[in-house]
């Protein structure tokens, strides 16, 4: 699995992107610096490109920090773990659960920071009311042998 990074857009910039008034994909360096200075985006460091060096595999067995906003995984591996576990409700920890199960079947992590940035458009966050239960579910998953999602992809295919 390859984990990239993201640049968060604020609500105003998101609205301008959606209405096609702004297109950050065509921006030069100074436009990005300005956008960061006026807080339209949270950071610009992910735009820096670094070569494909061995450091990208340093955390190959770690699930911590894996977020699925910018994750690449082979289809066969995603199917092998039955995709996302839909027993996770609301916000939190479903991406870490997916990473844990992928690692359990032998998939290695490769960091794509400074290589694969994405723009993350602003949106309302999901409810965090079930975060504690989702965290408990994740901690149990780390300790068990289960590699397939309880409620997952197989219900759709």
Briefly describe each language-model feature range.
Residues 35-72:
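A recurrent flexible, glycine/aromatic-enriched loop bordering the glycosyltransferase active site
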Residues 1, 70-72, 118:
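Conserved hydrophobic/aromatic beta-strand scaffold that supports enzyme active sites
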């Amino acid at each position: 699995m390859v984990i990239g990074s993201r640049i968060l857009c604020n609500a105003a910039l998101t609205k301008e992107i959606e209405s096609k008034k702004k297109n950050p994909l065509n921006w030069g360096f100074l436009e990005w610096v300005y956008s960061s200075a006026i807080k339209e985006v949270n950071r610009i460091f992910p735009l820096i490109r670094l070569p494909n060096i061995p450091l990208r595999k340093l955390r190959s067995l770690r699930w911590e920090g894996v977020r699925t906003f910018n994750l690449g995984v082979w289809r066969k591996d995603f199917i092998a773990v039955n995709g996302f576990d839909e027993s996770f409700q609301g916000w939190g920890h479903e991406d870490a659960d997916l990473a844990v199960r992928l690692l359990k079947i032998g998939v290695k992590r490769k960091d794509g920071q400074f290589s694969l940035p994405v723009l993350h458009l602003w949106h309302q966050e999901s409810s965090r009311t079930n975060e504690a239960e989702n965290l408990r579910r994740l901690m149990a998953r780390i300790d068990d042998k289960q590699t397939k999602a309880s409620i997952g992809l197989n219900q759709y295919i």
